[in-house]
From Swiss-Prot:
Species, as recorded: Nematostella vectensis (Starlet sea anemone)
Gene Ontology molecular function, alphabetical: ribosome binding; RNA binding; translation initiation factor activity
Name this polypeptide is given: Eukaryotic translation initiation factor 3 subunit K
Gene Ontology biological-process entries: formation of cytoplasmic translation initiation complex; regulation of translational initiation
Keywords in alphabetical order: Cytoplasm, Initiation factor, Protein biosynthesis
PANTHER family reported for this sequence: EUKARYOTIC TRANSLATION INITIATION FACTOR 3 SUBUNIT 11 (PTHR13022), EUKARYOTIC TRANSLATION INITIATION FACTOR 3 SUBUNIT K (PTHR13022:SF0)
Subunit annotation: Component of the eukaryotic translation initiation factor 3 (eIF-3) complex.
Domain of life of the organism encoding this protein: Eukaryota
Signal sequence annotation: none
PROSITE patterns noted in UniProt: PCI
Entry's Gene Ontology cellular component terms: eukaryotic 43S preinitiation complex; eukaryotic 48S preinitiation complex; eukaryotic translation initiation factor 3 complex
Length: 216
C-alpha cells in the first residue's frame, strides 16, 4: 500500500501543489502507512512539516511525532535534524515531541543504554512503529562497527537493547561479525582492512533536488 501510494504522493508534490493544505489528509495518511508498513519517504514527510509550518492551525502533534520517529530510524543520516528545523518552537514544547527529541539526543550522543531504558519506560511512544527497535539496533551496529574491532558479548548485548542467546547470535551472524568461545565478538571493521583505492562518486543533482527544495 505504501509503495503504491509513493508514486501518487510523488506526483502530488510536484509544482505549486506541494504546499496546498488540501493535500494534508492524503499526506498524513501516507505517514501512517509508513509507520505501519516500515516504509520511508523523507521528501513527503518534509512536505507535511512545511505545510504545518505555513498552516499552524492544521498541525497534528501525533503526525509530527511519527515523522520524527521515522527520521530517527534513519540514523546516522541527518534526517531528524532536517525535520526538526522546520518544526515551530511552540510545537517542540509539546510533551510527546519533547520526549522524541530527548530520545534523539541520547541516540545522537551514543548514550545507548540510557536510550533503551527510555524506550522501555516510554514504550507507548514507539508502539505501532513497525521496525523501530531493529532500525535503532542497525544504527548502533553501525556505531559499533566504526568504533570497535572487538567487543565483549555482554557489552554488545547491553548496547543492542538486551539481545541475548540465540537472538544475539543471529544478529552477530547477520552483521558479519564473529563470536568466539571466550565471549569476544570480532567486529567486521572496514578500517582494519585499509587498501589504497581511488574512489569516484557521482552525485545526481536530480536525486536530491526535491529534498533541497523541501528544506528551504
Amino acid at each position: 500500500m505504501a509503495a503504491e501510494m509513493r508514486v501518487t504522493v510523488s506526483q502530488l508534490l510536484k509544482g505549486i501543489d506541494r504546499y496546498n493544505p488540501e493535500n494534508l489528509k492524503v499526506l498524513e495518511h501516507y505517514v501512517h502507512l509508513q509507520v505501519h508498513e516500515n516504509a520511508y519517504d523523507l521528501d513527503a514527510n518534509l512536505a507535511v512539516l512545511k505545510l504545518y509550518q505555513f498552516n499552524p492551525a492544521y498541525s497534528q502533534t501525533s503526525v509530527i511525532s511519527q515523522i520524527l520517529l521515522k527520521a530517527l530510524m534513519n540514523l546516522p543520516n541527518a534526517d531528524f535534524i532536517m525535520c526538526r528545523c522546520v518544526i515551530d518552537d511552540a510545537i517542540q514544547q509539546d510533551l510527546t515531541i519533547k520526549k522524541v527529541i530527548l530520545l534523539a539526543e541520547r541516540l545522537e550522543t551514543c548514550a545507548f543504554t540510557s536510550a533503551w531504558q527510555f524506550i522501555k519506560e516510554e514504550a507507548s511512544l514507539v508502539d505501532g512503529v513497525t521496525g523501530f527497535h531493529d532500525a535503532i539496533r542497525n544504527y548502533i551496529t553501525y556505531v559499533i562497527g566504526v568504533t570497535y574491532q572487538t567487543i565483549e558479548e555482554s557489552l554488545a548485548s547491553e548496547l543492542l537493547g538486551g539481545l541475548q542467546g540465540a537472538q544475539l547470535q543471529d544478529w552477530i551472524k547477520a552483521k558479519g561479525w564473529m563470536s568466539s568461545d571466550d565471549g569476544t565478538i570480532y567486529v567486521t571493521n572496514q578500517e582494519a582492512h585499509i587498501k589504497s583505492k581511488n574512489i569516484a562518486e557521482k552525485i545526481d543533482f536530480a536525486s536530491v533536488a526535491n529534498i533541497i527544495a523541501a528544506a528551504r
